[in-house]
Amino acid sequence: MSTIVFGSFTCHLDAAIHQDNADRLAKAWTRPENRQVSNVHLLCRRAAKSLINTYESATASAWKGLEEKLQPMFAKREFSKTVTKRKGLRCFKESSEKFIEKKLKKQYKEERERFQFLNGPDAIVNQISVDKCEASVWVPFPHIIEKPSFTTPSMKKKVVFTKVRMSEASLQLFMRRVAANAKANGQKVEIIGRKRVVGHYTTKSRLTYFRTHVRHLDGSKPRYDLVLDEATKKILQLFANTSGFHHVHKKGEITPGMSGFVVNPMNLSDPMHVYDTDLFIVRGKHNSILVDSRCKVSKEQSNEIVHYSDPGKQFWDGFTNSFMQCKLRETDHQCTSDLDVKECGYVAALVCQAIIPCGKITCLQCAQKYSYMSQQEIRDRFSTVIEQHEKTVMDNYPQFSHVLAFLKRYRELMRVENQNYEAFKDITHMIGERKEAPFSHLNKINELIIKGGMMSAQDYIEASDHLRELARYQKNRTENIRSGSIKAFRNKISSKAHVNMQLMCDNQLDTNGNFVWGQREYHAKRFFRNYFDVIDVSEGYRRHIVRENPRGIRKLAIGNLVMSTNLAALRKQLLGEECIHFEVSKECTSKRGENFVYQCCCVTHEDGTPLESEIISPTKNHLVVGNSGDSKYVDLPTAKGGAMFIAKAGYCYINIFLAMLININEDEAKSFTKTVRDTIVPKLGTWPSMMDLATACHFLAVLYPETRNAELPRILVDHEAKIFHVVDSFGSLSTGMHVLKANTINQLISFASDTLDSSMKTYLVGGLEVDKCDEFKNVKLLIRSIYKPQIMEQVLKEEPYLLLMSVLSPGVLMALFNSGSLEKATQYWIARSHSLAAITAMLSALAAKVSLASTLNAQMSVIDEHAAVLCDSVFVGTKPYASYMMAVKTLERMKARTESDHTLNDLGFSVLRQATPHLVEKKLSPGVGAGLERIKLVGKVLCNLGIAAVAKTYTKTFHPERRSRFRRQVRHLRSVITWQPIQTPERRSSAEKRRRCLLHTPVDGKAILQSYRNFHKFSSKHSEDV
């Protein structure tokens, strides 16, 4: 780069100035003759001019070849036009050859006219005429040779349709018929104006709407959701003339899913942005204000608007994306669309409900409820539902054979359940105690098979291994063991207490070292609710001391909870009531072969005498475990409320299952308690034998192996009554009984063996017996007592819970309410028992609600809805009334029935119970009606007797001339009271004297008033005679 200075200006020259020229210029500058200013300036001008010419010639020579090469492009660009592309780029767009030819001809024409005008002779124009002589010569436009076209000429002929012309009335009629056809066939309607508007008819809440397609349904959020011109608007207004357009919408009726609905803005109650008063096209809500799709909104507002688009579109978008990602990539055929899409939707819904039943697929509570269900619950609840879905597919969609095969296999897998409990029990009885091969393998296979569908892959492998071992060993393998005798029998108690790891784990103890039940506490309520009674402390402990059994009695030490401060009296509580002494005999032992099974025998001392039980002191709200060793006291899971629980009638053995619950994992507590309640207890019943109880424990130990080490409560043996007594926290006042040595569930299971030689396995285990009550007879008693005050008074005082049986019939409940019995019960119990007073008040309120219902089914629905509230209010512990448990069971049954009916209704099934209430009402209502008729009859008789007595006294007292007038007044008064017409005999002719006719005499109001005044005066004066 070089520089040159022109005066005070400095110019930069390119490298075109050669170094030699620069040296020559510098030498010329240094000559003396050139140092003058004028010469220097001239020299600089010459040098600069030569350098510039040299640069221009070099530049021209460099660009000359490129310009020649690009000359055709420049020629085309002359006829090109500039266009702006999408991102603002401006470029040339080439023109076609026809366009260039047209332009050239136009230029030629213009140049020819200009040439002729300029070269023509000058003349003064006086007139305009055509000069035929040509004054100038013009070269004609060269002929352009067109390229031949090698394409086949089109054979299409232009079809010109005749224009349709209609009058205004004909056009209106035509559009109405198009709208009716689209509405009937579900077709789309397109209105072509400046913008195309597409819509269709849809139904919502039994109303028909016209729905237009708006832009936000495609996923965008534009400022204008829909653009309508006036012509399109008039046509749209004609198509939108539906029931939904004329319907008056209350506040909140415009909901999501109604985007594009055309409604009348004058019939909307919600606040809205109105575009005009003719139409309102729903877009969504912005700050609780409805927005019309035609309204212009800002970009920020369009993002803030809650669009009322169809929520199902989001579902199908996710379904489609996931389906495309998960579909099979490698198939041996080309997939085609053979099945109907709508039917595919029906079948997909059936499969969804069969696999994961729910009320809504978006409901989180349904999802959590299903995830918390055990396998047994799912199988019991949904196996029949799957069978129904399978039948629906078979009947309506037989072409979906693959779905039918899937549902069938899925149902069979869910029903894989081994219900052969008898076979399991028999195998356990025969060889359950045998630990040697091959019996140990048989027992293990028996334990695995009873699991049924709960077997895992590892269980199948283990079962196959045991079957292989069975093939290797023979069955007839015996051992000879020396036999023992009763005289040499010793079964001393263990010197060490059993170590219960569950009660020693720090993670399951609180800061005070007490056992923490956790989730087991909630599930233990299934035991306390069904098999325990709450002790009412206000009634004392005396009624709970004596525990009766089918073969005798035993006294509890619960009365010792009331202690005296007198030490001498306190020492007397340490003395129990001794039972009949029973020596060690064969009944105290259990043998298998010639060997004693010591855990199934009674405990003895070192000298062979039996260990007899002493008085066992009571405690409050504890579960006492540990049979032969030191006892452990565990807080009851429901002891926080301070209530005391005692085992119900015949269910003392429930304490054993409660002790097993300590060793159950918290996540299995629900399944364990339900298995005991629904499977074990119904089979055991009340007062089961020890063999059945041990078999049930073995069944639970197979399903829940951790319960084998669970400690047992103390078990006393009464050989005289042949009874096992499971001691609870209230101890035992009876002493002198034997003590069973079994300390764990695993040891107690030995009683289930059929090969065990022991008379004790037939002993009974349990509690009190239950008296059964007949519901129908008690309801009849309640109906009879409604109109008999003496019986009702006895019921209110002795069996107040019998009033709850009125919920079985709305007629009985309202008759009880109308007779005032519920009000009397409330007044009677308000000062004696607040719980009973609250129950009678609830029945009164329920009767008032029932009276408002017009039909019998509606009345039963009101009662069913309040059954749960009544059950929770009534079922509070145990009560000393025979009708208490009957009322509780009735309410629990109604509560369970209502819950199951709601579940069926939610799943879409119909309930047939609505057809049966009138049968029950028909059976019970005649008793109520007959009682009411008897009361009316008795009232009429008493009224007539009273009036007759007054008339008789009046006739004896007053003058005879006034008797006839008084009789007439009394007759009027009687007709008014009894609502009967007056019967007056009239004298007829001699032929009709023997006949009498009863005529209706009209009642005179003044005469009746006067008769009443006379009667009142008479009764006040002669009340003693009357």
Curated annotation (Swiss-Prot):
GO terms for cellular component: host cell plasmodesma. GO terms for biological process: proteolysis; symbiont-mediated suppression of host innate immune response; transport of virus in host, cell to cell; viral translational frameshifting. Residues 644-766 form the Peptidase C6 domain. InterPro entries: HC-pro, HC_PRO_CPD_dom, HC_PRO_CPD_sf, Pept_S30_P1_potyvir, Potyvirid-P3. Potyviral RNA is expressed as two polyproteins which undergo post-translational proteolytic processing. Genome polyprotein is processed by NIa-pro, P1 and HC-pro proteinases resulting in the production of at least ten individual proteins. P3N-PIPO is cleaved by P1 and HC-pro proteinases resulting in the production of three individual proteins. The P1 proteinase and the HC-pro cleave only their respective C-termini autocatalytically. The keyword Protease applies. GO terms for molecular function: cysteine-type endopeptidase activity; serine-type peptidase activity. A motif (Involved in virions binding and aphid transmission) lies at residues 618-620. A motif (Involved in interaction with stylet and aphid transmission) lies at residues 360-363. Keywords: Host cell junction, Host-virus interaction, Hydrolase, Inhibition of host innate immune response by virus, Protease, Serine protease, Suppressor of RNA silencing, Transport, Viral immunoevasion, Viral movement protein. The record marks Y308, S309, G766, G767 as: Cleavage. Its EC number is 3.4.21.-, 3.4.22.45. The N-terminus of helper component proteinase is involved in interaction with stylets. The central part is involved in interaction with virions and the C-terminus is involved in cell-to cell movement of the virus. Belongs to the potyviridae P3N-PIPO polyprotein family. This is P3N-PIPO polyprotein. It comes from Plum pox potyvirus (strain SK 68) (PPV).
